Amino acid sequence: MSLPQWCPPHSTLKRNPTTGEDVYCICKRPDYGELMVGCDGCDDWFHFTCLHIPEQFKDLVFSFYCPYCQAGITGKNKDAIINGEGSLPKTLWKRKCRISDCYKPCLQDSKYCSEEHGREFVNDIWSRLKTDEDRAVVKKMVEQTGHIDKFKKFGQLDFIDNNIVVKTDDEKEIFDQIVVRDMTLKTLEDDLQEVQEISLPLFKKKLELLEVYLGWLDNVYTEMRKLDDDAASHVECGKEDSKGTKRKKKKNSSRSRARKNICGYCSTYERIPCSVEEFVRDFGSNEEATKIHEVCTKWKCNRHLDWVSTNQEQYLQQIDSLESMQERLQHLIQARKKQLNIQYYEEILRRGL
């Protein structure tokens, strides 16, 4: 597939050599706040105006591929495409609401973006029915479907979304050729499997292990404070004046002591370093050490500042991103299967099977 006439040849330029600004799109200009869309193939960003896409279509983009990816010049699967092992990707659009001047995507299992627009469309059709006979036909259709949701789907081909049941060898040959050997579907399913079985469980496990380690660290802090309080009480009780009477404690002497916790960072927090008792004992015997059992024991550590919140936020963001990717891949697989099912049934009809 060749590039559109309005699209310049591909350039690998990512930064303006004069200004040092990052550049994007086919125009290789910086981001000045214009409406842009991200390519799912090469991860670059493109201006709607440069791609000749009306801005009102911004909510209808489901999966976008730039002209270079659609031509096989860039993208994750460009090598497979060059070797003839894959098909060129295409931009997928969400179904537009049936109201002519509305550019919002349809709700699931609906032809409208909202119930209000559904009622508006039906009311418009009803107002155009000129005779009682026309209204009687519509009334009969509603009565036959029995439910408003079924009426909304009246005339749709639900079998297109269902798995194909192959009955003959000829049908199997067509099914294998169109569906089984489709590299786009295989790539999407492989990506989904990797997200579900490798990436997502990995980061969930990392977050779980971090929480376990933080629980261990809290127990360490608790035991260290207990020892600190016991030591302070022992010192106060041992202070007696020359008459053999105990001195009065200074007001709020124990409370005025700053409560500090050690840094607690450990590069191998996926496993608990040792028991709480062992760590507290070893720390008590060597309070000058800056690391015990690979745990940073500095009282004020700038190197590992906010390491807990940083790691937690990183893992939560990764999990959220992967869950969004999982949902998106599931939708893409569903859409691709529907495309292939249509191709399969068209070929069945063409061959007269």
From Swiss-Prot:
Binding site for Zn(2+) 2: C39, C42, C66, C69
Pfam families, per database record: PHD
Stretch list, region Disordered: 235-255
Record bears the keyword Metal-binding: yes
Biased composition, class Basic and acidic residues, residue ranges: 235-244
Residues that coordinate or bind Zn(2+) 1: C25, C27, H47, C50
SMART domains membership: PHD
Residues recorded as bearing Phosphoserine in the entry: S87
Function: Component of the Set1C/COMPASS complex that specifically mono-, di- and trimethylates histone H3 to form H3K4me1/2/3, which subsequently plays a role in telomere length maintenance and transcription elongation regulation. COMPASS recognizes ubiquitinated H2B on one face of the nucleosome which stimulates the methylation of H3 on the opposing face. SPP1/CPS40 can recognize methylated histone lysine residue H3K4me3 or unmethylated H3K4. Stimulates the RNA binding activity of SET1.
UniProt name for this protein: COMPASS component SPP1
Organism: Saccharomyces cerevisiae (strain ATCC 204508 / S288c) (Baker's yeast)
